[in-house]
Structures are given as C-alpha cells and as structure tokens.
Amino acid sequence: MAKGSAGDAPNTRDTSFKRPKIRESCTHCSSQKIRCTKERPACARCVNKGLLCQYNISRRTGTRRHSVRATPEPETTISNAPTSSVPPDSVKIDGKQSPAMSDFALLDGLETFNNSLWHQPITTDIQDIDMQYFDFFDPGGYQAEPEPINSFDIDSTLLCGTSTAGYLPELDAEASTRPSSSSSPPSQRSDGGRATTHGGGGCISTALQIFSELHVSSSACPIAAGAPSHNIREFDHVLDSNRAALEKLSSILDCPPCCHDQEVLTALFLAVQKALSWYSAALDVAGDGEPTSPSSRVKSPPAFLGSYALGAQAQTLARAYVVMAQLQQHFQPLLAKLQRKSSLSALGARSSSTTSLSSVSSLQSSTSGSAVIECQKRALQEALEDVVAKIEGIKRG
C-alpha cells in the first residue's frame, strides 16, 4: 500500500520549466561580433577596457516585429532561440560575405531598423568637433574619446541650431568592418612613430600621392583623355581605399616636423576632402532596378541577408549605415586631429613674429598659408554638411 502511494504521489516539481540559457559571450563582445574569452564573472576584454561585463539570457524577449518577406516562414518550437536571428556569415554580397555589410550584420535583421538609431546628429562644423561618441548599438552607452585632447587649447564647444552638434555611433577598434592594415605604411613608420621619407618627397609627397589616387580627372581634361578610366569603383573598394587613405593621412599628422607645416596641412585637407567626396558618391549608388546615372562613380552588386535578397530601400539604408560607421571610426578622428594641428600651426606662426625684415616676409608667407588652410576648412565643412544631408534624406526615406 505504501509502495503504491509513493508511486502515485504527484510530482510537485514543474518539469515544464526550463532554466534560461545564459549566452556564452558577454554583451559587449557579442555586440561587436568578436570572440569572447568567456571568463566569469567578467571576461578579459571587459576587464582590460574597464567595461561592465554582463552575460545575458539568450532567449529573445518581447514580441517580434513583423518583417516583410516574400513567403511566410514556418513557426518554430525552439525555446532557446539565439538573440540574433542573423548569423554574421549570412550577410553577403554576390554569394559571399561582404566586409562592407558586416556593420549591417551588427543589427538584428531588417526588423531591428528603427528611426531612433538615426537620432544621433553629426557634428558638421570642423571647428567645433568634440570627440565624444554615443554608441547606438548599446542604448545609454557613453564613452569619451580614447585620445586625450586636453593638452591642446582648442575650443571644442559644440554649436547649437543649424550645426547638428552631435555624434556618430561608436565602433570599437577591435570590431573594424574590414581586415585592418597598419595605421601607417612601412615606408612612413620608424621608431617613435615618426614618419620617414616616402618616395624621396617626405610626408607632403605621400599626401599628394593619396590625393592623386582619390582624384577623378574630368573627362574634358586633354591630358587625362588618353589615360585609362577608373572612375567607376565598387562600393567595397571605395570603403577599403578610403580607410587606407585616412590611416596614412593620420600617420602624417604624427610626424613632428611636418604636422605643423602649412604646405603639408594644405595637402592633407585636399586629400581628406577627396576621401569625403567618395563617401558622398557611395551614398548615391542606384538601387536594384533603378537607372544608373551617367555621373555615378560607385556601383554595388545586389545584397543578400542569408538567402533573402534585400530590396532597393533596404540596400540604400544598409549602405548609409556602413558609410556612417566608417565616418565615425576613421574620418571624424582624423578631422579632429587635423583641426588641432592646423590651429596650433596658425597659433605658432603668429607668436613667432618679430620686427626683422626677414621675419616679416616669413610672417606674410605664413599668413597667406593660413588663409589657404581656412579656405580648405570651409570647403571641407560644406562637403561634410552635404554628406550629412544625404544621410538625413535616406533616414527619412
């Protein structure tokens, strides 16, 4: 009797309850799509960077938003669905993953596109760039610029009103969208990070060479008429060449004797403006099925999310996200450094004036060079505002 009672006793333990599965990678490593060392309670990367390391539940929470699909997907009964419905290697262009789309893979599929991600304005006045960023992949996250700038007496007060005083999203240096090359070419690197001569012409030769590589000659130019045309470039190639060019230009600014030379700074401003013009052209890529403009300089093959072909609007939005991310990661830090160096150069030219005839002539030359640099700053600011306007237009749809 006792045996029967023991066998028939109800099981008070709820077998339908399953303990939530904890993700193997921490939140920060997962959001940056990098390998986590998985130490508990905090991984080595978060400890080194002073970040709050958290291991979240892998189950998706909340109600999944409807996404527009050609065919409905069958319902799934998997209880431990991963947080991201899109594996990193599922985003590809032309049958393989495109490095340019890996920024887009940070987002949780098309349904996670939200207008709130675009509400971070961009600083367009290069005189007022303050290197502080908001991370729109980490809500509420705020970090200061890793490179200290308090040693320079530069006013970084943000403008109000029409200057859109704000920031691009932060991307960790370890989560570069492409295989990262050295920040400076071997021909420019030496002990102490000092740039050495390149091609016999030094830093100014390197800056002018970068300008030449990014420049597109006019079809009406009689000298360039017989040269082979490379005006049309792939979207991926534009991002690769711009990233490499900006890294080389940044290394020139680390050269003590050249970073204050006004001729070198003028060449740097010209090269930076050419790089920005390619970002602008990358935002003008015609979508699938749309006619290609004769003046278009950038083309992009169809993009896929897994086996799903993205529509024209989704591709345009994805390209804008990638351009926006690279502007923050490579362009804006270089622009801030260039602004500081040019301001210090102008300040040094004014403080070195004396009453001698030779110094007066030198001062006049420095003043003329400063005026040229100021013109370049205004032109660069107008070009940056144009890129921001294009991104805003894409955001509004």
Swiss-Prot record:
SMART domains from the UniProt entry: GAL4
InterPro entries: AflR, OAF3, Zn2-C6_fun-type_DNA-bd_sf, Zn2Cys6_DnaBD
This protein's record includes keyword DNA-binding: yes
Free-text disruption phenotype from the record: Blocks the expression of the cercosporin cluster and abolishes the production of cercosporin.
Keywords: DNA-binding, Metal-binding, Nucleus, Transcription, Transcription regulation, Zinc
Gene Ontology BP terms: aflatoxin biosynthetic process
Polar residues bias (residue ranges): 74-87
Record Pfam families: AflR (PF08493), Zn_clus (PF00172)
Compartment(s) where it occurs, according to its Swiss-Prot or TrEMBL record: Nucleus
Stretches for region Disordered: 62-92, 173-198
Annotated GO MF terms: DNA binding; DNA-binding transcription factor activity, RNA polymerase II-specific; zinc ion binding
Biased composition (Low complexity): 179-197
One GO location term (cellular component): nucleus
Function: Transcription regulator of the gene cluster that mediates the biosynthesis of cercosporin, a light-activated, non-host-selective toxin. The perylenequinone chromophore of cercosporin absorbs light energy to attain an electronically-activated triplet state and produces active oxygen species such as the hydroxyl radical, superoxide, hydrogen peroxide or singlet oxygen upon reaction with oxygen molecules. These reactive oxygen species cause damage to various cellular components including lipids, proteins and nucleic acids.
PANTHER family: MONODICTYPHENONE CLUSTER TRANSCRIPTION FACTOR-RELATED, OLEATE-ACTIVATED TRANSCRIPTION FACTOR 1-RELATED
Name of this chain's protein: Cercosporin biosynthesis regulatory protein CTB8
UniProt source species: Cercospora nicotianae (Barn spot disease fungus)
Gene from which this protein is expressed: CTB8
